[in-house]
């Protein structure tokens, strides 16, 4: 009975460590990936047709 409990606890700890390691590696991958290094969402407002040229100019000044 003790062996079964020890095996269950060790399997649980192993699964937890694998899932946390995978999440940590995914975080590092996203942190240092090409898309993470460039902020691609910075100029999403430029594709909005409701903005005038003056609005875009004002937004560019704000983002400087």
UniProtKB/Swiss-Prot annotation:
Positions bearing Phenylalanine amide: 32
Keyword Secreted present in the record's keywords: the answer is yes
Q: Does the keyword Signal apply?
A: yes
Provide the free-text tissue specificity comment from this protein's UniProt record.
Expressed by the venom gland.
Gene Ontology CC: one annotated term: extracellular region
A GO biological process held by the record: regulation of defense response to virus
Query: Can you give the propeptide residue ranges?
Result: 36-64
Q: Which UniProt keywords apply?
A: Amidation, Antimicrobial, Antiviral protein, Secreted, Signal
Q: Where in the cell is it found?
A: Secreted
Q: Which residues form the signal peptide?
A: 1-23
Name where it mostly resides: secreted
Family in the record: Belongs to the non-disulfide-bridged peptide (NDBP) superfamily. Short antimicrobial peptide (group 4) family.
Miscellaneous field: inhibits hepatitis C virus (HCV) infection by inactivating infectious viral particles. However, it cannot suppress established infection because of the poor cellular uptake and restriction of endosomes.
Q: What does this protein do?
A: Antimicrobial peptide.
Q: What is this protein called?
A: Peptide Ctry2459
Organism in which the protein naturally occurs: Chaerilus tryznai (Scorpion)
């Amino acid at each position: 009975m003790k062996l079964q409990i020890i095996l269950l606890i060790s399997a649980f700890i192993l699964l937890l460590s694998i899932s946390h390691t995978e999440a940590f590696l995914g975080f590092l991958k996203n942190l240092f990936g090409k898309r993470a290094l460039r902020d691609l969402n910075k100029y999403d407002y430029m594709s909005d047709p409701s903005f005038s040229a003056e609005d875009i100019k004002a937004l560019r000044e704000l983002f400087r």
